[in-house]
């Protein structure tokens, strides 16, 4: 898979469905039981990924799911989730095996974020962004970066994330305004980043910068900025409509000193990072997160349709034909999205020449699906779902973030169309 068709220079499943009557076997292990209960398929996945999927499900069941409502209600960054994932050795899923990680790719990232997202989307978002940051560091890591960052990540001792978005460039994350100056001894970084996931909680931040005002679009540098660097100033917390556990904050960098060893790749060539690493891994992480959320809404709807009965007839909602039809449409939407995401991951990991439109479209499709399915879940579950602080209400709020997070759904559909028609994306 290559994003070379972006042409920057010229541009300047099989699934185990719970259904309406599925019952979980009492013979399954805790982690496996959670997979079955949540309709999570591990068929046709590599054995190593199946193992990680089951391990993730066990962490979700024991540590993440029980506190998911609290995360939303208190707008609390899910430290317990990240700690539990670290203790289970899952923070290093993107780290090469040589440094203690699991060397997963796009498919693995989407599968693991799906497993987390069906219980706590905020936790999946925070974990996913850590994984994207890790992938960026690992892509061309020097020996110094391997030892200082990748080993610590694999050992569960280090959380990283991206700091790319800016107010001035909006959804165009690949056109930073933050600047660096090389003093000869170190870099000085000046600028303000917006919507930094894990803001104030990560141990390091992958920051994009542009060297000068006359630099071309796409001509920028990426650096690793340690969280304890003098000159890092966090602005007021941002409380979202949904994904309330995400500490998405603005970060002002005031002449922050960064050692030369923290430069990723060569200065000024980081458009490669933006479109060969950041974009595909971010899109797959978010697609998996929103697929998990859509599956959770599907599960909750099935549970309600089975349980809700009319006293005068004894009939349950699942016995009503219109409910059966509408539920089947929800199920079909989720399965189509899962199939697209799995195919995108496989093609991307194989470096398939036609992977690009699959990867570009998977987050857009997951966004459309999760908004549609959570909205339909609200309708089918009625007053029970519409009450304050209901789980489906939270799902509906969380789902809306899918269309807003950069690259937006409309932008991804535009890029997909241009890719399919042989046009440069930008």
Regions found by a protein language model. Name each.
Residues 1-13:
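Extreme N-terminal basic, low-complexity initiation segments
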Residues 3, 16-25, 29-127:
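Amphipathic, small/basic residue-rich leader segments at the start of a protein or domain
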Residues 65-72, 335-365, 378-386:
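C-terminal helix-coil-helix/basic helical segment that borders enzyme active sites and/or dimer interfaces
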Residues 76-87, 91-197:
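Glycine-rich flavin
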Residues 192-234:
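A short core secondary-structure module
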Residues 194-199, 279-285, 402-405:
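Glycine-rich phosphate/pyrophosphate-binding beta-alpha loops
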Residues 239-334:
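Glycine-rich beta->alpha junctions and the first turn(s) of the following alpha-helix
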Residues 381-426:
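Glycine-rich phosphate/cofactor-binding loops in nucleotide/flavin-utilizing enzymes
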């Amino acid at each position: 898979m290559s994003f070379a068709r972006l042409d920057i220079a010229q541009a300047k499943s099989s699934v185990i469905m719970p259904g309406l009557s599925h019952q979980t076997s009492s013979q399954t292990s805790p982690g496996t039981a959670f997979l079955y209960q949540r309709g999570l398929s591990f068929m046709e996945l590599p054995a190593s990924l199946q193992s990680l999927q089951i391990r993730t499900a066990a962490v979700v069941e024991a540590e993440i799911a029980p506190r998911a409502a609290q995360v939303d209600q208190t707008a609390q960054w899910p430290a317990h989730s990240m700690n539990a994932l670290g203790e289970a050795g899952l923070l290093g899923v993107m780290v090469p095996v040589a440094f203690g990680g699991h060397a997963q790719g796009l498919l693995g990232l989407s599968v693991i974020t799906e497993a987390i997202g069906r219980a706590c989307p905020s936790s999946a978002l925070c974990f996913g962004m850590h994984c994207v940051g890790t992938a960026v560091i690992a892509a061309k890591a020097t020996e110094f970066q391997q030892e200082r960052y990748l080993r610590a990540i694999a050992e569960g001792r280090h959380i990283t994330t991206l700091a790319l978005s800016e107010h001035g460039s909006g959804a165009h994350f690949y056109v930073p305004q933050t600047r660096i100056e090389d003093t000869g001894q170190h870099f000085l970084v000046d600028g303000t980043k917006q919507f930094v996931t894990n803001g104030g909680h990560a141990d390091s931040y992958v920051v994009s910068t542009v060297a000068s005002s006359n630099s071309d679009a796409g001509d920028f540098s990426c650096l690793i900025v340690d969280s304890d660097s003098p000159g890092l100033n966090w602005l007021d917390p941002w409380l979202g409509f949904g994904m309330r556990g995400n500490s998405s904050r603005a970060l002002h960098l005031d002449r922050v000193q960064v050692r030369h060893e923290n430069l990723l790749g060569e200065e000024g060539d980081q458009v490669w990072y933006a479109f060969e690493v950041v974009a595909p891994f971010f899109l797959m992480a978010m697609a998996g997160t929103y697929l998990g959320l859509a599956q959770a809404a599907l599960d909750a709807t099935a549970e309600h349709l089975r349980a809700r009965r009319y006293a005068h007839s004894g009939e349950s909602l699942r016995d009503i034909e219109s409910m059966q039809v509408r539920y089947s449409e929800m199920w079909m939407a989720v399965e189509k999205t899962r199939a697209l995401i799995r195919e995108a991951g496989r093609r991307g990991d194989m470096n398939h020449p036609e992977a690009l439109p699959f990867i570009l479209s998977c987050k857009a499709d997951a966004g459309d699906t999760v908004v549609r399915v959570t909205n339909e879940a609200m309708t089918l579950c009625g007053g029970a779902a519409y009450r304050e602080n209901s789980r489906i209400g939270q799902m509906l709020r969380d789902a809306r973030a899918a269309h807003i997070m950069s690259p937006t759904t409309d932008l991804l559909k535009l890029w997909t169309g241009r890719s399919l028609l042989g046009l440069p994306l930008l």
